[in-house]
């Protein structure tokens, strides 16, 4: 990571590292370590960051919502720290631009892959914790996860839009839901898919994504937005 990129990611995160090697490692995928044998990669930091994130979110929810049960708090926390939520945080911070990975991984779409970006968020959290301590990283997490926390509390995070759509439509009995691949474009390593969702022979949503599954989920998400007002 060159000096320009290092300064840029520090500015995006709002963290200025005493030990720059921590953030460099946090943004190094294991494929890069396989290609360059001396490179340290982020899997150990990811392991630590997962626990730090869980602790900070758990403590925040425990202190904030004294009237909620253990089950309710667990559900809210699971929405905040799930892969989908971490991916949204990664996109907001543009972490994908800074992750070091092998050329092979990048050519197969690794830079856009949800799991790689979500893992990088956890690794960055660990890097901040090791460099700045628990108080600082707690503030860091609450700052960058504030929107996700509010969405989880208000039950606005849906992990599986296709299932949510199915459940919503079951209220009206048997309804036929179909997903149709419209087209795909781009080179094989960066192919984007476009899909629509058809409900009782009517197109209700169109979605796109870097996999067929992601495109279908986004189509279902659009359909939900159009339909849910009718069920309020």
Swiss-Prot record:
Co-factor(s): Mg(2+)
What start-end ranges are recorded for coiled-coil regions in this protein? none
A GO BP entry is:
rRNA processing
Under the heading Pfam families, the entry gives: dsrm, Ribonucleas_3_3
Q: Which cysteines are joined by disulfide bonds?
A: none
Supply the name of the protein: Ribonuclease 3
Q: Which family does it belong to?
A: Belongs to the ribonuclease III family.
GO molecular function: any one? Answer: double-stranded RNA binding
Entries under Gene3D superfamilies matching the protein: 3.30.160.20, Ribonuclease III domain
Active site positions:
50, 122
Stretches assigned to the DRBM domain = 160-229
Source species, domain of life: Bacteria
The enzyme's E.C. designation: 3.1.26.3
- For binding Mg(2+), which residues are annotated in this chain's numbering? 46, 119, 122
- Name the reaction it catalyses: Endonucleolytic cleavage to 5'-phosphomonoester
- Segments forming domain RNase III: 6-133
